[in-house]
Curated annotation (Swiss-Prot):
This is Protein-L-isoaspartate O-methyltransferase. GO terms for biological process: methylation; protein modification process; protein repair. Catalyzes the methyl esterification of L-isoaspartyl residues in peptides and proteins that result from spontaneous decomposition of normal L-aspartyl and L-asparaginyl residues. It plays a role in the repair and/or degradation of damaged proteins. It catalyses: [protein]-L-isoaspartate + S-adenosyl-L-methionine = [protein]-L-isoaspartate alpha-methyl ester + S-adenosyl-L-homocysteine. Keywords: Cytoplasm, Methyltransferase, S-adenosyl-L-methionine, Transferase. PANTHER family: PROTEIN-L-ISOASPARTATE O-METHYLTRANSFERASE (PTHR11579), PROTEIN-L-ISOASPARTATE(D-ASPARTATE) O-METHYLTRANSFERASE (PTHR11579:SF0). PROSITE patterns: PCMT. It comes from Citrobacter koseri (strain ATCC BAA-895 / CDC 4225-83 / SGSC4696). InterPro entries: PCMT (IPR000682), SAM-dependent_MTases_sf (IPR029063). The active site is at residue 59. It is found in: Cytoplasm. GO terms for cellular component: cytoplasm.
């Protein structure tokens, strides 16, 4: 039985066009308040982005649901996340697939996310401190790749790490950003523009 606040959020997401009930079930199952600072805990189930420190944010639940839905996941999907951040999106993915690989460039955020995921008994996640622009070649190919920060253009390394039929979902742009979905078919990449968005930039390199 979900709380009234969770139920209200799920109804808002349905009204905004989220149709995948498995995605909505995952959002209901993951306690968002565990991934934010206590000062913002009263806003945990509001449909807004919140700061998590280091100049980063936890995405609004609508955007988490939308991007996850666009990945067209199955339980067997091999998933790569670029930008672990708080670990919230990671936890949603971990509820939907057998294993998630996640790369975070900021060491402190990676450590905090790993701790939160373990506290929630989500052990089907591998995290790595590294440059998200490069993906995770050693674990490729992936059926789905999700990027939670915006590069100015689609990183070539991420497209090449998609398996045949795989889907990459990411925000792209600088001043004006758009959510894109890239699907690999044979030797081609089919790119669709979904909607206008606003994300923090995907910065190259890594931080200790």
């Amino acid at each position: 039985m979900v709380s009234r606040r969770v139920h209200t959020l799920l109804e808002q997401l349905r009204a905004q066009g989220i149709k995948d009930e498995q995605v909505l079930d995952a959002l209901a199952a993951v306690p968002r308040e565990k991934f934010i600072d206590e000062a913002f805990e009263h806003k945990a189930w509001d449909n807004i982005a919140l700061p998590i420190g280091q100049g980063q944010t936890i995405s609004q639940p609508y955007m988490v649901a939308r991007m996850t839905e666009l990945l067209e996941l199955t339980p067997q999907s091999r998933v790569l996340e670029i930008g672990t951040g708080s670990g919230y999106q990671t936890a949603i993915l971990a509820h939907l697939v057998q294993h998630v690989c996640s790369v975070e460039r900021i060491k402190g955020l990676q450590w905090q996310a790993r701790r939160r995921l373990k506290q929630l008994d989500l052990h089907n996640v591998s995290t790595r401190h590294g440059d998200g622009w490069q993906g995770w070649q050693a674990r490729a190919p992936f059926d789905a790749i999700i990027v939670t920060a915006a590069p100015p253009e689609i990183p070539t390394a991420l497209m090449t790490q998609l398996d045949e039929g795989g889907i990459l979902v990411l925000p792209v742009g600088e001043e004006h950003q758009f959510l894109k979905r890239v699907r690999r078919r044979g030797g081609e990449f089919i790119i669709d523009t979904v909607e206008a968005v606003r994300f923090v930039p995907l910065v190259k390199g890594e931080l200790a």
